[in-house]
C-alpha cells in the first residue's frame, strides 16, 4: 500500500467568527440571530449558559458567574471577532463592565456586545431620547430595566410589563397577543419602543 503525504492548503480569508452565549432556556435567539444576519458573511457559534429560576437579580448575577467558562467553550483556543451575551436583563443587573471582563478572561481579543448595550448605542445613534419600555419580567426586574435606561439619560414616557418569572415561559407568549398588547400601549410622546426579551 502506498501512503502519500499531501500538503494541506488552508483558507486565506475566513469569515468573521461571532460567539453567542444563549440562555439554556431560550427558544428563540438562534433563529432570531440568523434572521438578522441572513446574507452576511459571518459564522455563528453558540454555547448555552445555565439559567436559574425565578428571574431575579440574585439569580441573574449567579448565572453571570459562569460567563468565562461558557465563553472558553466557544471554539476553544480559537480567536473570535465578537461575543454576544444574549441576556438583556442579565447584563443590566450584573453590569456590562462585569460581563465584558468575564468574557475577556476567556477571549481577550473578542469585542463584546449585549442586547441592552446594542440598544443603547442604536438609540443614541438615531438621536432618540424619549422611549417607552415593555418587558416580560417581574415588577422588580422591570423597574431595574427602566432605571438602567434613565441612567443612560433616556426619558421613559411609559412602561408596561407581563410579570413573568420563568424564562421558559417568556418564549411561549402568543405572538399575536403580544402584538395586540404593544399596539394598545400608551406610548406618550415616545420616539421609540424598547421591547426587552
Positions of predicted regions on the chain:
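N-terminal glycine-rich anion-binding loop in soluble enzyme alpha/beta folds
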Residues: 1-69, 134-142, 146-174
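Active-site glycine-rich loop that binds ribose-phosphate moieties when present
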Residues: 114-118, 173-183
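Glycine-rich phosphate/diphosphate-binding loops that line cofactor/substrate pockets in enzymes
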Residues: 74-79, 120-129, 187
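Short, charged beta->alpha transition segments
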Residues: 68-74, 116-121, 145
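Periplasmic-binding protein-like
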Residues: 80-86, 132-133, 190-197
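Short, well-structured alpha-helical segments in soluble
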Residues: 64-78, 179-190
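Short, acidic/small-residue loops that bind anionic groups at enzyme active sites
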Residues: 100-123
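General beta-strand structural signal in soluble alpha/beta enzymes
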Residues: 84-85, 111-115, 158-159, 194-195
Amino acid at each position: 500500500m502506498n501512503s502519500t503525504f499531501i500538503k494541506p492548503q488552508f483558507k486565506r480569508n475566513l469569515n468573521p467568527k461571532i460567539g453567542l452565549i444563549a440562555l439554556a432556556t431560550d427558544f428563540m435567539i438562534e433563529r432570531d440571530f440568523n434572521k438578522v444576519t441572513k446574507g452576511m458573511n459571518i459564522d455563528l457559534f453558540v454555547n448555552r449558559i445555565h439559567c436559574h429560576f425565578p428571574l431575579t437579580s440574585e439569580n441573574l448575577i449567579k448565572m453571570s458567574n459562569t460567563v468565562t467558562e461558557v465563553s472558553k467553550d466557544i471554539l476553544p483556543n480559537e480567536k473570535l471577532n465578537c461575543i454576544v451575551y444574549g441576556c438583556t436583563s442579565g447584563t443590566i443587573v450584573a453590569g456590562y463592565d462585569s460581563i465584558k471582563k468575564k468574557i475577556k478572561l476567556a477571549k481577550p481579543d473578542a469585542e463584546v456586545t449585549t442586547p441592552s448595550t446594542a440598544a443603547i448605542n442604536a438609540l443614541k445613534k438615531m438621536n432618540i431620547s424619549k422611549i417607552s419600555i415593555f418587558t416580560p419580567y417581574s415588577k422588580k426586574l422591570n423597574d431595574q430595566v427602566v432605571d438602567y435606561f434613565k441612567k443612560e439619560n433616556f426619558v421613559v414616557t411609559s412602561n408596561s410589563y407581563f410579570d413573568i418569572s420563568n424564562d421558559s415561559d417568556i418564549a411561549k407568549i402568543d405572538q399575536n397577543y403580544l402584538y395586540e398588547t404593544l399596539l394598545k400601549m400608551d406610548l406618550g410622546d415616545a420616539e421609540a419602543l424598547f421591547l426587552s426579551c
